[in-house]
C-alpha cells in the first residue's frame, strides 16, 4: 500500500474517532463514524485478495446500514423532542433503533455474523484495529446514552453475545476468527454492566484493548494465522509463544493475571445491584471462552508436533520482543496487584 495513502487513512481514523468521542451533537458523532468507515475500508482491502474484497464489501454494507439507523434514530428524537444533544435521547423508538444500530456496529449477537468474516479477510494489524479502535466510537455513544436505553434489552444482548461468542469459537481453527468470537464475548461483559457502572465499562474496554493488542502483535510477529502454524512456531520463537500463552490466559480471566480484574469487578457490581442470577449466568457462559483460550494456549506452548529433530529449540536468528509488545505484555499480565489503586480511580 502507498505510504501516503496509509498515512491519510491512519490520520482519518484518529480524526474520526476523536470527533465521535468528543461530540455532543448527533450530526458530528455520525460524521466521525462515517470518516472512520471510509478510512478503514482501504486498509481491509489493501491485499487485493478476493477474500479481502469480500470482507470490505460486507464491512461497508453493515456499517452504512448501522450509520443510517443512527442518523434516523437521532432525527426521530429531534423531531419529537427538539433536541440534537446525544445525552437527551428520550424517545422510546429512537432508543430502540439506536441500540440496534450500535449492536450492528459492535457486532453484538444477533448482528454478529459480519464480524468474524471481516476479520478473517483482513491482515492481523487491520484485524487489531477493527477489534479495538473501531469499537471505541460506538461504545462511547452507548456510554453517553446508557441511562436512556432499555436495561432488559441490553442484558439480553449481553447474555446472548457471551453465549454465542464462546460457543461459536469452540470449533474454529483460524486465529483471527477465534479472536473475533473472543471480542464478541468480551463485549457481552461490557454491555452487561454499562447501565449500572459506565466507568467499569471503560476500564474493561481499556484492559481488553491492551490484552488483545498484545495477542495480535505477537501473532503478527510470528506470522501465525491458524492453529497448525501456531503448533510449529514454538521451536522457532519460544519467547513470543510464551507471551501469547500468558496473554490468552489473561484474556480468559484467570487469576493472578490482569484479565481477572474486570470480570471480578463486574461480578461484584452485578451482585451489588441484586442481579446475582445474571452474574452467575454470565460467569458460567464465560467457561466456553475459557475452553478455546486454553486450546490456543495448549497449541502455542504446551504441546509439540511430531518432529525429526532431537532438540526442542531449532537454531534460528532470535526474534526479540519489540518495545510496544513488551510493554503491552507487562500490562496484560501484571496489573492485578494494582487493582485497589485502579478501583479508587474509578
Swiss-Prot record:
Keywords: Electron transport, Membrane, Mitochondrion, Mitochondrion inner membrane, NAD, Respiratory chain, Translocase, Transmembrane, Transmembrane helix, Transport, Ubiquinone. It comes from the Eukaryota. Its main location: mitochondrion. GO terms for biological process: mitochondrial electron transport, NADH to ubiquinone; mitochondrial respiratory chain complex I assembly. The chain crosses the membrane at residues 25-45, 52-72, 95-115, 124-144, 149-169, 178-198, 200-220, 242-262, 274-294, 326-346. It holds the Pfam family Proton_antipo_M. It is an enzyme of class 7 (translocase). It catalyses: a ubiquinone + NADH + 5 H(+)(in) = a ubiquinol + NAD(+) + 4 H(+)(out). It is found in: Mitochondrion inner membrane. The keyword Electron transport applies. It is a multi-pass membrane protein. GO terms for cellular component: mitochondrial inner membrane; respiratory chain complex I. Core subunit of the mitochondrial membrane respiratory chain NADH dehydrogenase (Complex I) which catalyzes electron transfer from NADH through the respiratory chain, using ubiquinone as an electron acceptor. Essential for the catalytic activity and assembly of complex I. Belongs to the complex I subunit 2 family. This is NADH-ubiquinone oxidoreductase chain 2. The gene is MT-ND2.
Amino acid at each position: 500500500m502507498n505510504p501516503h495513502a496509509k498515512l491519510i487513512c491512519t490520520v482519518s481514523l484518529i480524526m474520526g474517532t476523536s470527533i465521535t468521542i468528543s461530540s455532543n451533537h448527533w450530526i458530528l458523532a455520525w460524521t466521525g463514524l462515517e470518516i472512520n468507515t471510509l478510512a478503514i475500508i482501504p486498509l481491509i482491502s489493501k491485499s487485493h485478495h478476493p477474500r479481502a474484497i469480500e470482507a470490505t464489501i460486507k464491512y461497508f454494507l453493515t456499517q452504512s446500514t448501522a450509520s443510517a439507523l443512527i442518523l434516523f434514530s437521532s432525527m426521530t428524537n429531534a423531531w419529537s423532542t427538539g433536541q440534537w444533544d446525544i445525552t437527551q435521547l428520550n424517545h422510546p423508538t429512537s432508543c430502540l433503533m439506536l441500540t440496534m444500530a450500535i449492536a450492528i456496529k459492535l457486532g453484538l449477537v444477533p448482528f454478529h455474523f459480519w464480524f468474524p468474516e471481516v476479520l478473517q479477510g483482513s491482515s492481523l494489524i487491520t484485524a487489531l484495529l477493527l477489534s479495538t479502535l473501531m469499537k471505541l466510537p460506538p461504545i462511547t455513544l452507548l456510554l453517553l446514552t446508557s441511562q436512556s436505553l432499555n436495561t432488559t434489552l441490553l442484558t439480553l444482548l449481553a447474555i446472548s453475545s457471551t453465549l454465542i461468542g464462546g460457543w461459536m469459537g469452540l470449533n474454529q481453527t483460524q486465529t483471527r476468527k477465534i479472536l473475533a468470537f473472543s471480542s464478541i464475548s468480551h463485549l457481552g461483559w461490557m454491555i452487561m454492566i454499562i447501565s449500572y457502572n459506565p466507568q467499569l465499562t471503560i476500564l474493561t474496554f481499556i484492559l481488553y484493548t491492551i490484552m488483545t493488542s498484545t495477542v495480535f502483535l505477537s501473532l503478527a510477529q510470528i506470522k501465525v494465522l491458524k492453529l497448525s502454524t501456531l503448533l510449529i512456531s514454538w521451536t522457532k520463537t519460544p519467547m513470543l509463544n510464551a507471551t501469547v500463552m500468558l496473554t490468552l490466559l489473561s484474556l480468559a480471566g484467570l487469576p493472578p493475571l490482569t484479565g481477572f480484574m474486570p470480570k471480578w469487578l463486574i461480578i461484584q457490581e452485578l451482585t451489588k445491584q441484586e442481579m446475582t442470577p445474571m452474574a452467575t449466568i454470565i460467569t458460567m457462559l464465560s467457561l466456553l471462552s475459557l475452553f478455546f483460550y486454553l486450546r490456543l494456549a495448549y497449541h502455542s506452548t504446551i504441546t509439540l508436533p511430531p518432529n525429526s529433530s532431537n532438540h526442542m529449540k531449532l537454531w534460528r536468528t532470535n526474534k526479540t520482543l519489540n518495545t510496544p509488545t513488551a510493554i503491552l505484555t507487562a500490562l496484560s499480565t501484571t496489573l492485578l496487584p494494582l487493582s485497589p489503586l485502579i478501583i479508587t480511580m474509578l
